[in-house]
């Protein structure tokens, strides 16, 4: 499959004002790629717009849980940008808590953001992507779409579902001008864990301790991860591991699909402890 030239069209990035999405936007803007950035954070969009002054960037404030708002934003994007040849879905959040600590409302909230927000923007943008001579969709899944740890049920559920959506859509679009792939990051220092949510039933200090323990395990720099995600998009890759931990866990889950947790549990012990009080 011929590589995609991202400078010959517009790349739409969800979660484009923060974390991984913002880093991808910086690197693409430096290459001269036109961008449409979607985020719910108005202030962060203002900051990234100022940072990328001189680049071809449009920004769109959208809550991805609102389907009508998503489709309206995509309509604005297609009116502003003549050719859209890439979508990179980075928007998402995390949720810490055991099944007994989490409410149904908390779990549904994360699924709405991580899964249905991804589905909604992909569906809305698909006609514009089909109109391009060649286009690619990159969905950010997670290493937790390969291995499901304790204490991260809603996050793992949402990311496994993103993986399934991405694979099924890739098969539906096989033979068309639009290719689809998923990337599986692990250990990227974006702050998603430190700024993520936790069950209301958890002591905030305990949640902060668990989040800090998880963040301490992260070693991949956002700039390196962003460069790999951009390469995967250009190459129209179907499946890309991002970070050393992702590659290791990918192998582990293949070799020991029913017992990988025995290996993962020890290093994650403090990161999933949401019950031990702080003395």
Question: What residue spans do the PLM features occupy?
Answer:
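Substrate-binding pocket helix/loop in short-chain dehydrogenase/reductase
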Residues: 98-99, 103-109
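Residue(s) in the substrate-gating loop at a strand-loop-helix junction
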Residues: 142
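Active-site helix of classical SDR
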Residues: 122, 158
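Canonical Rossmann dinucleotide-binding motif of NAD(H)/NADP(H)-dependent dehydrogenases/reductases
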Residues: 2-35
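The beta1-alpha1 cofactor-binding region of Rossmann-like NAD(H)/NADP(H)-dependent oxidoreductases
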Residues: 42-43, 61-72, 104
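Conserved glycine-rich Rossmann-like NAD(P)H-binding loop of the short-chain dehydrogenase/reductase
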Residues: 33-47
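SDR active-site lid
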Residues: 175-244
């Amino acid at each position: 499959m011929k590589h995609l030239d991202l400078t010959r069209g517009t790349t739409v990035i969800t979660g484009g004002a923060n974390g991984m999405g913002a880093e991808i936007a910086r690197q693409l803007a430096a290459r001269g790629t036109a961008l449409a950035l979607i985020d719910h954070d108005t202030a962060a969009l203002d900051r990234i717009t100022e940072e990328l002054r001189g680049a071809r960037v449009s920004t769109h404030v959208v809550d991805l849980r609102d389907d009508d708002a998503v489709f309206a934003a995509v309509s604005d994007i297609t009116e502003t940008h003549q050719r859209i040849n890439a979508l990179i879905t980075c928007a998402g959040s995390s949720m810490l808590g055991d099944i007994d600590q989490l409410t149904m409302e908390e779990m549904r909230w994360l699924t709405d953001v991580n899964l249905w927000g991804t589905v909604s923007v992909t569906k809305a943008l698909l006609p514009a992507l089909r109109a391009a001579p060649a286009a690619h969709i990159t969905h950010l899944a997670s290493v937790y779409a390969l291995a499901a740890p304790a204490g991260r049920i809603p996050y793992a559920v949402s990311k496994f579902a993103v993986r399934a959506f991405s694979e099924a859509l890739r098969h539906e679009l096989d033979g068309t001008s639009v290719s689809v792939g998923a990337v599986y990051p692990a250990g990227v220092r974006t702050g998603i864990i430190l700024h993520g949510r936790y069950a209301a039933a958890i002591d905030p200090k305990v949640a902060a301790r668990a989040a800090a323990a998880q963040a301490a395990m992260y070693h991949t720099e956002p700039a390196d991860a962003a460069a790999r995600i951009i390469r995967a998009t250009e190459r129209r890759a179907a499946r890309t591991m991002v970070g050393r931990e992702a590659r290791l866990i990918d192998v582990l889950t293949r070799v020991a699909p029913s017992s990988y947790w025995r290996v993962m549990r020890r290093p994650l012990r403090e990161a999933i402890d949401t019950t031990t009080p702080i003395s």
